[in-house]
Amino acid sequence: MATAVVKALKKKFQDREIIVVSPHSGLWMNNPDVYRIYLMGQTPYFYEDFIKDKDTIVIKSDPYLHQDYINKKVHCIEAWCVQNDVEYNGEEPEIFLTEQEKLEAEGSLINHGKPILLLQTNGGSGEQYSWVRDMPYKTAAELCKKLQEQYKILHVRHESQPSIDGIDWLHSPNIRQVLAAVQYSHARLLIDSFVQHASKAYGKRSTVLWPVDKIGQLGYDLHDNIVSSYEPVKTHMADYYLTEDDIVGQSHMCPFPKDKDIGKISLKIIETIF
């Protein structure tokens, strides 16, 4: 989403060089709107080189704290722009791959003998499960059984995250290799994480599961968005601050009932993929 914000920033500050400090430098590589990229925490002499005694505009903000985002009135991208007094005109995420990156991705995926389906079940980089965002393991495993005959399923995940029996793992320390695989995949079954944003950047319609409905704030109309349906169990919201469900998904506030039926959800997902 940040690439969309930078695109809007460049339209406002056309005579400025944009320097990005990010934990994910690979997302920004070759972006024509960006002058320099620095990895967060690796910024030697940054203040002296770019800020001290210079006419520099510093933009550092958290869109998740914007009033209209909290109140579910605007998408995160728009909130981010408005928060920094930048006009939002529907800018969308962007990724810029070289032709060599595309060729390597295509070559690595072409020999599986089946169309490629990318599966992402967990977000973040840790092993903790978030009921707010992540796909239930039981749902993912059942879907894989039904889809693996037609598709070669590649599971996008970190080493510490749960695997699914019989499903190959797609991971690389170079996030751009994963992003390139997104472009050359045939179908995608995702959650709200970086692959759904990359799919939007490529215009690749995907199926995205939402345990909690945050489509208006974090999703895209391009995708087939499937929201879980359930009768919530009463839980106290004592630990919520500015939102009714933080991304961590604290266990003692999970409203999902026991043995929530996944049959109808699984069928709907399969229908969107086929």
Walk through the language-model features, giving the residues of each.
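Catalytic machinery of carbohydrate-active enzymes
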Residues: 1-274
